[in-house]
Amino acid sequence: MSKVTVVGAGNVGATCANVLAVKKVASEVVLIDIKEGVAEGKAMDIMQTAQLLGFDTVVKGVTNDYSQTAGSDVVVITSGLPRKPGMTREELIGVNAGIVKSVANQILTYSPNAILVVVSNPMDTMAYLTYKALGLPRNRVIGMGGALDSSRFKYFLSQKLECNANEVEGFVIGGHGDTTMIPMTRFATYKGMPVSELISAEELEQVAKDTMVGGATLTGLLGTSAWMAPGAAAAAVADSIINDQKKMIPCSAYLEGEYGYNDITIGVPCIIGKNGIEKIVELPLNEAEKALFAASEEAVAKTTAVLKEIGVL
């Protein structure tokens, strides 16, 4: 019997719960939200697809009753506010830090051994906050961003190669932001062959650029942030934990000397299994990639420093 809680029944949270159910990742999924009735309604809607889609996962929606989340193996935290017009970055970080910190504390009260997957934005900063505020072992706090960015990278590669995205391997490291992520074009492969052998350097560079603005492109088309791929990416991380798949998934992890950095939570390739982050994979970066990673780390550290400036940490 396995149990996953998804905090926040917005588009991303509900999609995550739906994917977890349809893929039969866990025997029970709890969807919890602060707004009366929303989680219950979305859970009921998901459950009414069980016969149509052939799953037996029980999805339960609750309003702000964290006792219902007791015994969760994995908790996905999607709660937080989007940035509103006129709101400063510091104000947004302050508001979301308060929400994430409160949620994480309540979760641990009822599920002291849970592994936490952080989706709330700014994601690298919220993962850092969760790790620092709760004092958990670093393997138990995972930022989801790289899983999503890497999926988008593989999508754009597959479009350029005119193939199925499942035939492509590729990943993104660095911060979860359109100026801080680093699509690792040098390591991208199609059926084991370097993609750089199949398309031009200019085409590969365009794929990287498309990946970096992938989120913004969708926001422009949808009029709001995307939710299908983000929800599925969070579910994929939870799946690798629950079923001990030991997949290599780029995630935001707290570094203790890896890549030459300390006291930063940033996207790196991780082996994800039943213990959460079981290993951080250190890639042999060339000088250009090291420079990009250094710039990304500096930008993420600057955002993360706001937590101390506003007194949250």
Feature-to-residue mapping (PLM):
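Rossmann-like NAD(P)-binding element
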Residues: 52-114
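Extreme N-terminal starter segment of soluble prokaryotic enzymes
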Residues: 1-4
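Rossmann-like NAD(P)(H) cofactor-binding subdomain of soluble oxidoreductases
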Residues: 88-154
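N-terminal Rossmann-fold NAD(P) dinucleotide-binding loop
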Residues: 13-14
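Glycine-rich Rossmann-fold phosphate-binding loop(s) that bind the pyrophosphate
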Residues: 9-10
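Conserved N-terminal Rossmann-fold NAD(P) cofactor-binding segment
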Residues: 34-72, 301-310
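C-terminal substrate-binding/catalytic lobe of Rossmann-fold NAD(P)-dependent dehydrogenases
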Residues: 134-140, 149-313
